[in-house]
Amino acid sequence: PLEHVEASKSVERSDFIFWNYDQQFKALTESQRKVVECESLTSPLRVDGAAGTGKTVSLLMRAYRLLKMHHDQGSPFRIIFFAHSESTSLRNKDCFSLYPNSEYYLSPSSEQTILFTTLFAFCREFAHIDRSAVIEDNAADSKTYQLMLIDDVVKSALESNRVKTYRPLISDEVYALFDSEKTDRATLINMLQHEFSVQIKGRTDCSIESYIELETIPNGIPCKTKPEKELIFSLFNDYQNMLQSQNTFDVDDVTIEAISHLNAPFWRRKRQNDGYDYIFADEMHLFNLNEQSVFHFLSKDTSSKEIPLCFALDY
C-alpha cells in the first residue's frame, strides 16, 4: 500500500534549501516532517502537492536522515536518487552537499552512500550505450527532439496525402486527430509520442502484427481497427527510419535496453549486493511507464513485491 503524504504548505523563504539540516528540520511543516520521519522502508511513499510546497527538500532530508541513521547503527545502506533532468539532479546534489558529513555519504565507497543521477544517464550507463549513440544526452532534450521528429513525420504524411488515403477506412475520431481545426498539432504530436513509446516500444516487439493485436488504452490514440493501427504504425516506421538515418536511439530505446539487462540472470544475482536499499524519484510525473518500470529492478530484495521507493509528483 502507498503511504500518502501531502506537502501542502509552501516554504516561504527562497533560501530555505541552503539552510543547514537542523534549521530546515525545525522549519518543516507537519506534512513535510511526515515525509522525513516516515518509518516504513518497504512500502512506496508518495509525496504530492503543487510546485513550491517543499516536496524535493523533504525527499533530500529523508535521504539524509536514513543515511545518518544507518551510519549511527553501523549498518550498510545504499540509496539512489533519481531526477528527470541533469540540472535538477545537480541542484539536488548541491543541496545535499550542504548537510553534515555529506562528503562521506556521496562517496561510492562508503558503507552508507547516495548516488544522484538521472534515470536516463543510469539506463544509458547500465546498458553500456555510448553517449554519441543517443539523440540527446539529457532526457528532457531527448524527448523534445522526439517531438520534433514526430512533427516532421506528421507533416510529411499530411503533405503526401497518406492520411487522406486512409480516410474511408478510419473512424471520424481518429481522423479528427489529424485535422488541425479539431485537434491542436501539439496534442497530436504528444499523443503519437506516447503511442510510440509506451504502446509500440513498451508493449510490443515493434512489429505491425503484435501492434494490431494490442488493446488500446484509455489515454492513448483510439485506434481500434486494423487500418487505424496500420496508419499509426506507418508513422512509427517513418520515425524509426529517421532515428536510423541519424544512427541514434531515443530515450525509450535506451530505457528498454536497460530493462533487458536489469531483468536478466547476471543482474538478478548481483542485485543482493549491488542493488539499492532505498530509491528516490523526484518529479515522478515526468517519467513515462517505460521509465517507471526501471524502479522494479533496482532494490536489493528480489523477493518483495513492493518497492522501497519514495517519489514526489506535482498535482
Predicted regions mapped to residue ranges:
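The feature marks helicase ATPase cores and/or their adjacent C-terminal helical subdomains
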Residues: 1-315
